[in-house]
Amino acid sequence: MLLAIDNGNTNVKFALVNQAGAIVQRWRLATDIKRTADEYAVWLNQLLEMEGYTRADVDAVVIASVVPRAVHNLQELAAKYF
């Protein structure tokens, strides 16, 4: 599955997209440029597990952002945990 991350000024939105292109799960978190990759990972891992998924189910990550200062931590999240 694809993990799509949309980083906006107010919220960071996460969606799991299956092979058919359908969104099977979505979550939202308040944007905070101080939030670390590790913090994102703990939060996201818990939500994945609550819905019956694991990080191993994610084959790829795509990030869209209008908050340049927050991109680095999201890129680190993708590289380190997926």
Where are the regions that the model predicts?
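A short, N-terminal amphipathic alpha-helix
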Residues: Y40-A56
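Short beta-strand-loop/turn "lid" adjacent to the catalytic site in phosphate-handling enzymes
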Residues: E51-F82
